[in-house]
Amino acid sequence: MDEKWRLSKKDALAASCSSSSTSSKSKFSRSFSTSASSSKAPAFVRSSSTKCSVPSSSSSSISRSSSKKEKGSITQKYSSLAKEQKGRFYIMRRCVAMLVCWHKHDS
C-alpha cells in the first residue's frame, strides 16, 4: 500500500490562521492507493476546528466597533501565544538544569 502525505486545502488555511491548536494535532491527510485495483480509496482527513474565517469581499468595509473586536482578539491571540512560549521556555529551562545536574553528578 502506498501512503501519500499531503496538506489538504482546508487544513492549509487552518494552519495559516490558527495559533496554538497546531501544536497538538496533525494537519496532514493520508490517501491510500493499492496497485491491485484501479480505483483509489477516499482520502481520510484528520483536521482540527479553528476559529479563523476566510475573508470575503463583503467584509472589506469594517466599522469602528468591529475593528475594536478584532483588536481585542488579536491582543488575546498574542497573549495566548506569549503564555505558550513562556511555558515552553520554562520546560526547556528545567530540562537543561536537570541535564546539567546529572552531568555534574556523573563526573
Curated annotation (Swiss-Prot):
UniProtKB keywords: Cell membrane, Developmental protein, Membrane, Transmembrane, Transmembrane helix
Function: Small polypeptide acting as a regulatory molecule which coordinates cellular responses required for differentiation, growth and development, probably by restricting polar cell proliferation in lateral organs and coordinating socket cell recruitment and differentiation at trichome sites.
Required for DVL/RTFL small polypeptide activity as annotated region, ranges: 73-104
Cell compartments where the protein resides: Cell membrane
GO biological process, one term: negative regulation of cell population proliferation
InterPro entries named in the record: DVL, DVL_RTFL_polypeptides
GO CC annotations on file: plasma membrane
Protein name (record): Small polypeptide DEVIL 9
Bias type Low complexity, positions: 13-65
PANTHER family: DVL13, SMALL POLYPEPTIDE DEVIL 9
Membrane disposition: Single-pass membrane protein
Keyword set includes Transmembrane: yes
Start-end of Basic and acidic residues biased regions: 1-12
Family affiliation: Belongs to the DVL/RTFL small polypeptides family.
TM region positions: 9-29
Stretches the record annotates as Disordered: 1-79
Name of a matching Pfam family: DVL
Source organism per UniProt: Arabidopsis thaliana (Mouse-ear cress)
